Amino acid sequence: MWKHVSQVLADQFGAYYSIKHKEKIHTGEMHEAWIIDDGIQPVFLKVNDKTFRSMFRAEADQLLLLAKTNTINVPNVYTVGCSHTHSFLLLEALPLDKTNPVDAMGKFGEQLAKLHLIKGADNYGLDFDTWLGPEYQPNGWKENWATFFSEQRIGWQLQICREKNLVFGDIEVLVKKVAELLAKHKPQPALLHGNLWIENCATVKQEIFTYDPACYWGDRECDLAFSELFEPFPRQFYESYDRTYPIDEGYPERKAIYQLYYLLNFSHRFNKHYVELTKKFIHDILSR
């Protein structure tokens, strides 16, 4: 694999590129991650077996899609490659600082609002499917937001949970309830990061960069809801966002519904206390 990576990098940066140093920095839920360099140009490498090529291709396409908006900062994409045994994604290696200063987060709120203000779709979905963490995320286009979110987000995650022997009651009942609660809400489709929480943000030279997206065109409130779920962003982020693109007064009523999608995902991935929290959210939603 390393020989193939070296050849791809030589094609990308010029024949002079030769890997002189490599350091494994993370073996996460799915992929290995490395920093490799030739002494001049460091590169971030995600690697897995060759069956993951489509996942890496989707991640690259999402980062390119976000980069084209000239709003939020994302790593540059170099290429997606595949050897006989492995697939990999090569990205810009950034000196990430996880402190995320308040001033930088305030500016990030404005940048995210500008992303959400872009009009590029009439319906909800994306031209290709993506992943939320290790789980497939279907993005088939729908004209109706309530149908899209209830079926392709809540219903989909509930089905994955059930396949992993994690049952949260009758799937059809909850999907119907979510559709009912969202029935009158017809948001302008916004391009979403889709996986926006503090773990996917870091600072580079006083600018917030974000990564690991799960993009689609949907309700902008989904990004805001996940950002508030576990470790909310600083107050300045939301104030800056609201100044640039005022938050709808009905958002508090929908926030828990959108957060449920991520809680279901975390429940079947990590279990632990997420299951009990998810049960509480479901109970509260069904009680409305």
From Swiss-Prot:
Source organism of this protein record: Pasteurella multocida (strain Pm70)
Top-level lineage group: Bacteria
Function, as annotated: Ketoamine kinase that phosphorylates ketoamines on the third carbon of the sugar moiety to generate ketoamine 3-phosphate.
The keyword Nucleotide-binding appears for this protein: yes
InterPro entries xref list: Fructo-/Ketosamine-3-kinase, Kinase-like_dom_sf
Family from the record: Belongs to the fructosamine kinase family.
Binding site for ATP: E92, A93, L94
GO terms, molecular function: ATP binding; kinase activity
Pfam families: Fructosamin_kin
Protein's name according to its UniProt entry: Probable ketoamine kinase PM0587
E.C. number(s) listed in UniProt: 2.7.1.-
Alphabetized UniProt keyword annotations: ATP-binding, Kinase, Nucleotide-binding, Transferase
The UniProt record lists the keyword Transferase: yes
